């Protein structure tokens, strides 16, 4: 299980975008894809069936402890590529 905290921005986006904590856990623990971005952060993506297969994209700073989710959103660009 990935340990993390949410930034203030991520908490706000979670509420605004109606992203459940279960979806966050599933994305971090069993991502469809995981990569280090050019920004140095880890990017996790996962298709969420409850959102008609929308792709949840989580950006996490792994250089701090505990790891911090910087932002999270449903990535329309990735959903189109499916």
What is the role of each PLM region?
Residues 1-82:
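Ribonuclease/tRNase effector modules and their secretory precursors
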């Amino acid at each position: 299980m990935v340990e993390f905290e949410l930034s203030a921005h991520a908490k706000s986006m979670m509420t605004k975008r109606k992203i459940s904590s279960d979806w966050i856990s599933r994305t971090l623990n069993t991502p469809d894809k995981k990569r280090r971005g050019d920004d140095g952060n880890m990017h996790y993506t996962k298709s969420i069936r409850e959102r008609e297969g929308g792709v949840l994209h989580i950006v996490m700073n792994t250089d701090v402890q505990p790891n911090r989710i910087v932002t999270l959103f449903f990535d329309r660009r990735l959903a189109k590529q499916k």
